[in-house]
Amino acid sequence: MSRDLNDLLTQSEETVQALIADGAETELLYEIEHHLASQDFTKLEKAAVELVKQGYHVDDADEFEDERGKRWFAFMAVTDAELDNDILNRQVREIAAIADECEVEYDGWGTLIEDEELDDEDLDDGEE
């Protein structure tokens, strides 16, 4: 049910490369958010339980409608990790296997990179 594992692994490696190219430091821990969704809340809940057993923090599910008006439920499975292809590929494989077992969609992962160099002057809107 999830995207093809090879596509997910390629996307993961490309994401790591892009983050590093943008200045992300590989030795820091980042909050990695893996995205899962299903139209069947019970199946999504089963995936959440399995991911918690594997050590992931699972957010409450959000409900949304797709462009066709179909109702979906989604959550993020969160963990801290370095921007390391081996670590992240292991997570992708693990989560994709759980998603397939539970018949839910896994769409890969993302993270936020905070720019510590931003200060109050950078955020000034020009009004004084």
From Swiss-Prot:
It is found in: Cytoplasm. SUPFAM superfamilies: Hypothetical protein VC0424 (SSF89946). The keyword Cytoplasm applies. Pfam families: RraB (PF06877). GO terms for molecular function: endoribonuclease inhibitor activity; enzyme binding. One of its GO terms (cellular component) is cytoplasm. Belongs to the RraB family. Interacts with the C-terminal region of Rne. This is Regulator of ribonuclease activity B.
